[in-house]
């Protein structure tokens, strides 16, 4: 089993990033795929049209999300913790995922960087409401 941890800078305030990660319609906007999500502990979720499924464990509005991601019959839960920190450029999103099966690690690491984080970054960089004017 492996662990993944990385920080990503998202060009939006933590409150907005939190909503993008916890509101189904917003998830669908930035992923382009069907999503099921309720920001309530002990509820099931599905992202990217069932590519990622699991159970929500904990929420701290605007700051933290803890989920269990399912990997088939794996005996130990893979726990994902996302912490959102204020950053001069918006939000520092800290991602930590534990108990990743060795055979899935490269795909998971690539997915976090090239799909999950990149999708959020692109969503907010392209958002005219954010007023991304250069100073």
What are these regions (language model features)?
Residues 1-36:
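Hydrophobic ligand-binding cavity/cleft-lining segments
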Residues 5, 12-13, 44-48, 107:
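Alpha-helical scaffold segments that form or flank carboxylate-/histidine-based iron centers
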Residues 21, 31, 60, 69, ...:
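Short, flexible helix/strand-to-coil boundary loops that buttress conserved ligand/catalytic motifs
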Residues 28, 36, 43-101:
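Hydrophobic-ligand binding "helix-grip"
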Residues 99-135:
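A conserved amphipathic terminal alpha-helix motif
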């Amino acid at each position: 089993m492996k662990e993944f941890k990385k920080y990503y800078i998202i060009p939006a305030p933590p409150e907005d990033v939190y909503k993008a990660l916890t509101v189904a319609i917003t998830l669908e906007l930035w992923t382009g795929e069907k999503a099921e999500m309720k920001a309530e502990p002990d509820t099931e979720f599905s992202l990217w049209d069932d590519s990622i499924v699991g159970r929500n464990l904990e929420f701290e509005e605007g700051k933290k999300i803890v989920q269990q991601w399912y990997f088939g019959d794996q005996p130990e839960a893979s726990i994902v913790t996302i912490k959102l920190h204020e950053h001069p450029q918006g939000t520092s999103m800290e991602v930590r995922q534990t108990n990743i099966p060795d055979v899935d690690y490269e795909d998971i690491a690539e997915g976090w960087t090239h799909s999950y984080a990149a999708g959020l970054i692109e969503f907010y960089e392209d958002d005219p409401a954010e007023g991304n004017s250069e100073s």
